[in-house]
């Protein structure tokens, strides 16, 4: 059997001159010179090669094809008279002896230029994703994703973890987001759910006697899109360890991740073990965020006490937080523009003042703070050319977090950009008051072990302590201001589990009903265990230097959770609904 090709389009060099070769690919570009000469740029997965068409019959074939048609070229390699140093194969060209059409592009014009597809409208890019992915710059992100996943698998295997797949069809459980439900044809009125995470299965593996588990796990959550979150599905490096503590988990990831980030990242510098550990409350107080970007050296100070009787109503009696930015060269216009950006992100108005060359407070709200300059100087650096940005009010903490990230990124002397800076956020609150319910709810993972175990839960039950003061043995991994993962030491004791759920108004029967397998397994003797699940998509997004997670997913949905290339979601035939015992009630969105 003859080979389809002898070389790829990135392989031939000047040393190959005179060789007979066969290459295949897409016609990226055709440039005709007069009526008897054409230059064709042939592109495959690996690169491009110039083909010089001089034969009349071959010219006729080329002229009858549209760009992006696929062809096979048999011919001879010759050295170019005019070389192109920007191209890997720029020293040579192929003179064909035979051209064969493999697949015609039947359209005279394309939805966008392949090599400029990133400039195209996102809807067009998603609809014609198979064309978008022909762009080497777009394709490179997918290649990077493959390389990172392979490196993660190798590293986890080296650390003694077994890759075990867990079910995709499972039971619905209250894990935070909405489930994707799958009707069970053989069980009318009942549904499977696609797993939001393999949380229960991986804990059950630990109770089954496995010691170290991992998988590149698909997770399905019916939630809205964000820049760093894709709707529908995502993938995570899911891992769990039996007879393990928080420190055991930290040790594995602190060994696995830095080499991968340094090797594959836009920057080649990454934190080394041990990563900095910051308690949740400290992170919120110092950075206004539980996802601090430690490349930025700015922190905030709470100066509320100085403004209890301020003349400025926006500060008077409010929570007031300030960030001092020394040696700041931003102009007034730049400051105002950044403040406007921050207000859009945080939903709260922010303010500023500066210390001029003479050490005097000026600009912005300076006249309202100059009276407490001496007191401010005890907590802020107020040397000449210092800018101070101010957040005030009910949402001051959120607002100041946005100010730190926005102004920090704008001031090069406060932003060590070209590195990957990891940190652990630890000691999260176990409970919170729900925004919608107004009642006590789990803050994050309901399966976390509370710090203090049963004793602290009983104290809360008796009213001796506020449940909001209970902390979980839970942790987040953050890199460059992006949350990569949440994890926890698990609550493996069924009695402690029930007591933890009782505080959020779920009794023993509720726990047994919602988590029957895990509860029963724990009753047969469970090991203390811990785990975490860094998001693969977010990691690759960081490594690629992309701001949108859709850029590193081969076939992403749009912001409205639609796959406009495949036409999903879509209506289905009535016969299918009848088989599943489903009736559509209410208005139905028509297919486009």
Regions found by a protein language model. Name each.
Residues 1-592:
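Class II aminoacyl-tRNA synthetase catalytic cores and aaRS-like
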């Amino acid at each position: 059997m003859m080979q389809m090709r002898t070389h790829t389009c990135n392989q031939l060099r000047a040393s190959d001159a005179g060789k007979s070769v066969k290459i295949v690919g897409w016609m990226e570009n055709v440039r005709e010179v007069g009526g008897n000469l054409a230059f064709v740029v042939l592109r495959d997965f690996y690169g491009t090669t110039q083909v010089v068409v001089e034969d009349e019959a071959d010219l006729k074939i080329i002229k009858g094809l549209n760009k992006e048609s696929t062809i096979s070229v048999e011919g001879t390699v010759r050295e170019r008279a005019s070389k192109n140093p920007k191209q890997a194969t720029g020293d040579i060209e192929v003179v064909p002896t035979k051209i064969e059409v493999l697949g015609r592009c039947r359209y005279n014009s394309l939805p966008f230029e392949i090599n400029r597809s990133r400039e195209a409208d996102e809807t067009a890019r998603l609809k014609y994703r198979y064309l978008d992915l022909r762009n080497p710059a777009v394709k490179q992100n997918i290649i990077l994703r493959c390389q990172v996943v392979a490196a993660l698998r190798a590293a986890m295997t080296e650390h003694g973890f077994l890759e075990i797949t867990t079910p995709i069809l499972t039971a619905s459980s209250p894990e935070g987001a909405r489930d994707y439900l799958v009707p069970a044809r053989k069980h009318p009125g009942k549904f499977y759910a696609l797993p939001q995470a393999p949380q229960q299965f991986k804990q059950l593996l630990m109770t089954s006697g496995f010691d170290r588990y991992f998988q590149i796990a698909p997770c399905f959550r019916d939630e809205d899109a964000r820049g760093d979150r894709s709707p529908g599905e995502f993938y995570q490096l899911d891992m769990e360890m039996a007879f393990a503590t928080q420190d055991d988990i930290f040790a594995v990831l602190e060994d696995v991740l830095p080499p991968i980030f340094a090797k594959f990242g836009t920057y080649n510098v990454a934190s080394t073990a041990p990563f900095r550990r910051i308690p949740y409350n400290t992170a919120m107080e110092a950075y206004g965020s539980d996802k601090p970007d430690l490349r930025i050296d700015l922190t905030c100070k709470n100066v509320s006490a100085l403004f209890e009787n301020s003349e400025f109503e926006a500060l008077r009696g409010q929570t007031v937080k300030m960030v001092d930015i020394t040696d700041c060269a931003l102009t007034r216009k730049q400051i105002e523009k950044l403040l406007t950006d921050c207000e859009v992100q945080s939903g709260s108005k922010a303010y500023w003042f500066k210390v001029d060359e003479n050490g005097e407070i000026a600009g912005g709200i300076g006249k309202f703070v100059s009276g407490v300059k001496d007191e401010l100087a005890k907590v802020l650096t107020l040397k000449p050319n210092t800018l101070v940005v101010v957040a005030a009010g009910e949402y001051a903490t959120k607002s100041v977090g946005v100010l730190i990230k926005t102004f920090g990124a704008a001031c090069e002397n406060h932003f060590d950009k070209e590195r990957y800076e990891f940190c652990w956020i630890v000691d999260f609150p176990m409970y919170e008051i729900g925004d919608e319910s107004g009642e006590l709810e789990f803050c994050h993972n309901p399966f976390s072990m509370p710090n203090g175990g049963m004793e602290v839960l009983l104290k809360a039950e008796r009213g001796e302590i506020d449940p909001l003061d209970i902390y979980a043995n839970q942790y987040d991994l953050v890199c460059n201001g992006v949350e990569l993962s949440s994890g926890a030491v698990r609550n493996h004791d069924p009695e402690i589990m029930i007591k933890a759920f009782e505080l959020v108004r779920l009794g023993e029967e509720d726990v047994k009903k919602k988590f029957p397998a895990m509860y029963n397994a724990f009753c047969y003797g469970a090991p203390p265990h811990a785990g975490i699940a860094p998001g693969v998509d977010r990691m690759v997004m960081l490594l690629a230097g992309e701001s949108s997670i859709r850029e590193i997913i081969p076939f992403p949905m749009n912001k409205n959770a639609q796959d406009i290339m495949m036409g999903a979601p879509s209506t289905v035939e009535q016969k299918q609904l009848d088989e599943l015992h489903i009736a559509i009630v209410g208005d139905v969105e028509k297919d486009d």
